[in-house]
Every structure is written in structure tokens, then in C-alpha cells.
């Protein structure tokens, strides 16, 4: 923990994120993908069922001994509260009721947030959209670990602690990297949670409150489902920055494991992502993936080559915004225009390093030179 770390220890690339290019290609090849886009009522159904189960469990545990309270807190509440936190992901993309019903999506987010005891559904949406816009951007991706995290959590013990404190890091990291003003919806979210917490504590007591609150803290920490925090973008195979997980825990987590699929098409509900994979197997079957989130956590801790620094970092989008004096992101139309220009200039080799890119350029120029020489020889023969 805390060993010397330099800029070269991070995985730097000089191309844009790969999903924009993939999305464009896939829609041209498989136009039927558009039929999967939209919203899915099952998201709301799963959220409401999970919230009801948590409220019933909060009533049940109030009369149990503490050892059973803690056991159920980790096993049941940890699993269900983590599932609800992942529902913020679907709701944040307006996949529960569609883009035409934003208020319904926000209300569902408030309901999903209740058992977690910590206001987060609105804030998650506010920052998560930027993760898609600026994936891997050194300045603007709120999901990237800070340099301090990468320096602090390097050893096996450090990486174990890194996983345990994920709930804190995920809450604080965006505020440090790309802080944004507090919104009215966030204040409403806070007031609703304070009222809910007070009701639980007053009417059901300490055990019920502990069951819910620590279900969030433990469930988002060292818990099997927390493997998705690591599996999604940490570099397990050189040259790839997004990974999918195809395991049974997807049933509890709105298919969040289908992460390559989600980044390719954020407007497709999680329930439909397996269908996307079936439609375009040539775009997914050849990619490295995970089948166990527990193994992901184990490998992350044990492998000395893996750590918080094992993320792709780039500056292509923030540099473009800087050059056009739009890095503050205030002028949305200007930002979108610049990002559209970046998308149009997206590199056709999105996963290559600087050295590999140089090699590709050399090969390209060599090919052109060979073509020119052959053309000259052919022309000379005719003369």
C-alpha cells in the first residue's frame, strides 16, 4: 500500500472509446437491433417486489438476536440492496418508463432508494451519464479511480480494503473528480430518505435500521455482486477496456453483467441485452468476458498486475473540449457538437496503444509504398 506510482503505471491510449464505432457498425449490419430499444415494465415490477421484501424483512428482524440480524443483513439485505442500487442504473437511463416519462422514472428511483437508507438515486444518474459520454477520459469520467486511490490501494491488503470501502469511494469519487452543483431533485431525494430512516428507526427500532443501512454498506463492499465494480472496466486482458459477465447473478441485477452490450446500446433495457448478444454474436463471442464475479474479486486481489490503476485512460474528449473552450460543460449544444465531431473522427482501431498505433501507421504507409512501387513497375513495363 502506498508504493511509488508514476504516470506510466496507468494504461494510456490515444484513441477514443470503442463503443461509438461498434454501435454505428452494428446498426448498419443488424438494423433489427432498433426493435430492442425502449423501456421495460419488468424493471419497475422487480424494483417494487424487492422493496416490499426488504420492508417485510425489516419487520421480521426486529425480534431476532443480533447474530441473526447480522447474518441476514449480509446475505439477504446486502444482496437485495445491491440489486436496488443497480436498478438506479436502469432507471437513470429512463429504461423503466421511457424518455417520455422522466417523472415516473424519478419517482421509481425514489422508491428503489428507500431501503438503502442513503440518498443516491438522483446523484447516480447525474454522474453516470458522463461515464458513457467520457468513458476513460482522464478528466471527465467520474467512474475512473483517482490517482490517490491508485497510489494507496496497491498491495493485496490494500486491494481488499479497496473493495470493502467501495460504497464510500463511489459516493465521494465523482465529487472530487467532476463536481457538479446540488440539484433540487437531490434535495428531495435526501429529505425522503431522512423521513424514511426516521420512520424505520422510530417504529421498528435499531435492528431493522441496521439491517437496511448495513445491507447497503456490506452489500456494496466485500460481496459477490460487488464483482461487477471490478469486472466492467478493469483491464484483465491487454487491449480491452469493457468486459461482460455471463453468470447467474445477472438474474438479480437487471443483467448489468452484459456490460459491453450496455455500453454499445445504453438505450436497450437490461432484460433485452441477451437478445442483443444473440442478434450480433460476431461482435460479442470473440471478446474476453467473465463467468464468476467472485473469481473476479479473487483475481483482482491476488494478481499483482491488477489494481485501481488497471483502467484505460485517455484525453481525446477533454482535449477537444479544452481546445474549443468548452471544458466546463456549461454550453450543452456546443459540447454535443464537439463530441459529435470526435465521434466522426473515431479511430478504427479503438483498443490500440500508442506503440501499436505507430506500428499500424508504419504498416499502412509501407502498404501504400508497395502499391506505388508496383504501380510504377507496371507503368514502366508498358513504356
Where does each model-flagged region fall?
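Non-catalytic, topology-defining segments of multipass membrane proteins
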Residues: 1-78, 110, 114-211, 271, ...
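Generic alpha-helical secondary structure signal
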Residues: 25-28, 103-107, 221, 225, ...
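Transmembrane alpha-helical segments that form the membrane-embedded catalytic/substrate-channel core
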Residues: 78-88, 120-122, 167-171, 212-238, ...
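Alpha-helical hydrophobic/aromatic positions enriched in membrane-embedded helices and signal peptides
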Residues: 43, 74, 81-82, 185, ...
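Acidic (Asp/Glu-rich) catalytic motifs at the cytosolic membrane interface
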Residues: 81-98, 102, 123-136, 234-235, ...
